[in-house]
Amino acid sequence: MAAVVQQNDLVFEFASNGMEDEQQLGDPAIFPAVIVEHVPGADILNSYAGLACVEEPNDMITESSLDVAEEEIIDDDDDDITLTVEASCHNGDETIETIEAAEALLNIDSPSPPVLDEKQINNNIFSSSEDDIVAPITHVSVTLDGIPEVMETQQVQETNADSPGASSPEQRKRKKGRKTKPPRPDSPTTTPNISVKKKNKDGKGNTIYLWEFLLALLQDKATCPKYIKWTQREKGIFKLVDSKAVSRLWGKHKNKPDMNYETMGRALRYYYQRGILAKVEGQRLVYQFKEMPKDLIYIDDEDPSSSIESSDQSLSSTTASSRNQANRSRVSSSPGIKGGAATILKPGNSKAANPKDPVEVGQPSEVLRTVQPSQAPYPTQLFRTVHVVQPVQAVPEEATIASTMQEEAANSSVPSIRTIQASTQVPVVVSPGNQQLHTVTVPLTTVIASIDPSSGAGSQKFILQTIPSSQPMTVLKENVMLQSQKPGSPSIVLSPTQVQQVLTSNVQSICNGAGSVASAPSFSATTPVVTFSRSSQLVAHPPGTVITSVIKAQETKTLKQEVEKKAEDDLNEDAEKSAQQPQPYVMVLSSSNGFSSQVAVKQNELLEPNSF
């Protein structure tokens, strides 16, 4: 006869030896033995964890010897079931014997019993509220009549496995508060974002080696020409341009801020033995890759520092040339006049300055000529400065008036005549004389700020800068000093072939601010308006006419000699021919009290045509 229960239960098999007689079964002397066998299962190791038994005097286990006194099932927040079972006997002596018997039974009957020490064996056999339910406990009771009874109770066993229920609150707090190690970045945390592809190392994670890092730097535009560059790309030879910067990048990538080139150099020497890198003999900071990958991105090593240095050199040379020109063009003024004013324009291909923009003028006694080059030769835009200086003995106050003019191209159909007005407006009109002159209104507020109209004491000094109309790009020296040398011998000579026009008006009209020029007059050699000669004074002017000074260049012979000395090699015969011919122009200067015509032309020097 056999009885089989489920997998976690026990199998009780009674061996009868073939005796089926009721008399034989009822005889206590031949009562069959009880054989307890284990059914193989996953939880069989924990089957006898909480089994308790009581040894009776008649060596039989009765039901009354095993008593379950208390069972508690508590549901807490973690849905853990806590089962507390206390084994109680009739007296204290039986309790000790019961514990010893249970320990002996567990150590003997279990195939692989758990090791229990004395701390775990106490009156409360099962653990406290933090335990898990593992497997049911099977209580076997055999009465004197030979009828076995099976009773199952739930068992709770203390486990050491990591689980949310089994961990104590302190352990849970430790796990929650533990800081995770930040992942290693894929690229150095620097200004150049270098994307380096990670490679597996025997399937044990990702890492970037130093030689891979150097290859990544060589493929990055932000670092290749600046920190590291190829010297012989086909041979795999490269140079560390800035070894400190490369070592800092490698240190940031490895999270080592104290990385230097010596430490990185030891890693590079390790690659010599591996056959990855080689040191190029005779050259400092130059290495060679033994094997070059095929999918490299090559960057043209155009060193930006060279372009920066070249631009700095060009800028410094431009600044030096402008300083030299300024020193050459400095006007020598009278000893009593001090101070100065300078107008400086930035060199470069910038837009032409607007003639309406105000020019900064302080207390000028000398003005530095500045030239702004333009990309196209037409229209030629040149800035000139005109000084009207009064001698110190006539006026105690320092008086200097500066204005800038802009000349259009000589080949324009209609020459534009402009008067750029400063705070003290000096009307100066310059135009090519070989072309028609149209009507223009010249506003005049005050001619010279420091001159009293009622006083006519003292002669005037004029500094003029003119450009020949036939050569727009050839500029003569612009600082032409007109000085009064001898009262009886004026040095201004106007030949009949040159046409000059003088603005004639009365004093009141000029003071009111209106001056007009005849519309489109026909200029020729036979109809001059005002003619000067060496032996005669100013002629053909009615009373009340404002006397204006008309200035021309020097005579042809002297001008030719000056041009031949100072001209560049690129000035051909056309330039010399144009220099020989006197350049006619019309200039109008007016004052309320009139100017003396006894002035002399002083040509300082000629400017090189390509000086600006």
UniProtKB/Swiss-Prot annotation:
Modified residues (Phosphothreonine): 190
Subcellular location: Nucleus
Record has DNA-binding as a keyword: yes
Compositional bias of kind Basic residues: 172-182
Domain of life: Eukaryota
Gene3D superfamilies membership: Winged helix-like DNA-binding domain superfamily/Winged helix DNA-binding domain
Primary localisation category: nucleus
Example of a GO MF term: RNA polymerase II cis-regulatory region sequence-specific DNA binding
Expression tissues: Predominantly found in hematopoietic cells. Detected in other cell types such as fibroblasts.
Keyword entries, A-Z: Activator, DNA-binding, Nucleus, Phosphoprotein, Transcription, Transcription regulation
Any Pfam family hit: Ets
GO cellular component: a single term: nucleus
A GO biological-process term: negative regulation of T cell receptor signaling pathway
Phosphoserine: residues carrying this PTM: 110, 163, 167-168, 187, 431
Basic and acidic residues: bias regions: 562-577
Region (Disordered): 156-199, 300-361, 562-586
Feature: compositional bias, Low complexity: 305-322
Compositional bias ranges of the Polar residues kind: 156-169, 323-335
DNA-binding region: 208-290
Biological role stated in the UniProt entry: Transcription factor that activates the LYN and BLK promoters.
Family: Belongs to the ETS family.
Summary of subunit composition and partner proteins: Binds to the underphosphorylated form of RB. May interact with other transcription factors in order to regulate specific genes. Interacts with RUNX1. Interacts with SP1; the interaction is inhibited by glycosylation of SP1.
PANTHER family the record matches: ETS, ETS-RELATED TRANSCRIPTION FACTOR ELF-1
Protein name: ETS-related transcription factor Elf-1
Gene: Elf1
